[in-house]
């Protein structure tokens, strides 16, 4: 089991980073995921890959909920807006990886998860639907919405042609 889990580590690390947007949080999430994978038995009706991504996602959701409560008291919106304004001034020109990461962070969690599994991890719709426990049609609609929102966030002045 350890060998199979270790083969999934690079993909799980990318997925964890796409969820958290921070390498340190991603590594913490990855560590917690691996710990759970190695201590809990694989469900009989699941593949290791789908189960591993599901465990990672569920741990992230748990932490996301807890962090949301903690962050609401700690964040100073005025300072954060000031920092973002200075960063925007410093970055002129094309779209940066940081902008894409920030935009992905603003997507609803279910769209961010779907986009990450399909576009970053290269999963098929059926594999992603197994990981997220939703029908393939839901994966397709979430992916379309995520791509549309991401495009609008990164290119706000782009005209929509009907």
Question: What role is predicted for each listed range?
Answer:
Residues 13, 34, 108, 112, ...:
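C-terminal flanking helix
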């Amino acid at each position: 089991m350890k060998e199979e889990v270790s083969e999934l580590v690079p993909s799980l690390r990318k997925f964890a980073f796409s969820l958290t947007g921070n390498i340190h949080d991603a590594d913490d999430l990855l560590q917690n995921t691996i710990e759970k994978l190695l201590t809990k038995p694989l469900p009989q009706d699941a593949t290791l890959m789908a189960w591993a991504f599901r465990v990672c996602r569920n741990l992230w959701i748990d932490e996301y909920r807890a962090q949301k409560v903690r962050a609401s008291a700690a964040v100073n919106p005025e300072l954060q807006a000031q920092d973002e304004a200075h960063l925007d001034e410093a970055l002129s020109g094309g779209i940066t990886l940081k902008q894409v990461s920030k935009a992905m962070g603003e997507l609803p969690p279910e769209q961010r998860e779907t986009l990450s599994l399909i576009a970053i991890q290269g999963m098929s719709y059926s594999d992603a639907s197994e990981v997220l426990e939703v029908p393939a049609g839901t994966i397709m609609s979430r992916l379309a919405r995520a791509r549309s929102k991401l495009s609008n966030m990164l290119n706000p002045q782009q005209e929509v042609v009907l």
